[in-house]
Structure formats: structure tokens, C-alpha cells
A protein has these predicted regions:
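Internal catalytic-core helix/loop-beta-alpha segment
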Residues: 73-108
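Active-site acidic carboxylates
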Residues: 1-76
Length: 108
């Protein structure tokens, strides 16, 4: 049966640090995550991992997902090294494996 998915892109400490009304943005993202989960949808958290830009280098504080973001245990996490969430990531395969037909996109 086709499912929906929400892609939460770059909702990380680094990019969110200076975001205008960042806490309101996270609350809105969490509300949408909850609705997708209630309909048995797939939650995908996408993290930017930069090899030379220190705030987003894997393991650095800025790389971590925002502390207020709903990071439920069943959420799938995809790491990306470019601005394109599908380029050289398993995202396309994850969408197919989970029979995703409708995609909602949010993030920073």
C-alpha cells in the first residue's frame, strides 16, 4: 500500500542557530512529523555532513540534529555531502523500499 513520507532537511544545530523564529519552525516541523507518523508514514531526517565547513563536519556540535526536533526511534536518518538530498545517498532506495508515493518536504 502506498505511503507518505516527510523529508526533514538540514534541521541541524548549525543551520538553525541563526534562523529567524527557529523554535517556531521546529514546532511546525514536529507537528507535521506527528501527522505523517499518525498516518503510518515514513519520517526521514536528512543531515548535511560537510567535509571542510567546520560547523557541519560530522561529529561537531553544529552537525547534530536540533535538540527540539522530534527524533523518534523509527525515523530514518540519511547523511548527505551535497545540497541535493538524493545525490549519492540511499534516499531514492529508501523511498522505494518503503513504498512511498507522496512526499512532504520541510527543513531549513
Amino acid at each position: 500500500m502506498p505511503r507518505s513520507a516527510i523529508l526533514v532537511i538540514d534541521a541541524q544545530i548549525g543551520p538553525m542557530g541563526g534562523a529567524y523564529e527557529g523554535s517556531s519552525v521546529i514546532k511546525a516541523i514536529n507537528k507535521t512529523i506527528s501527522k505523517v507518523r499518525e498516518s503510518s508514514g515514513v519520517v526521514v531526517l536528512i543531515q548535511h555532513c560537510h567535509s571542510s565547513y567546520e560547523p557541519l563536519m560530522k561529529g561537531n556540535t553544529g552537525w547534530g540534529l536540533h535538540p527540539d526536533l522530534d527524533k523518534s526511534p523509527e525515523a530514518l536518518v540519511v547523511e548527505k555531502e551535497s545540497s541535493d538530498s538524493f545525490y549519492e545517498t540511499p534516499l531514492d532506495d529508501l523511498m522505494a523500499e518503503n513504498d512511498v508515493e507522496h512526499v512532504y518536504i520541510t527543513g531549513i
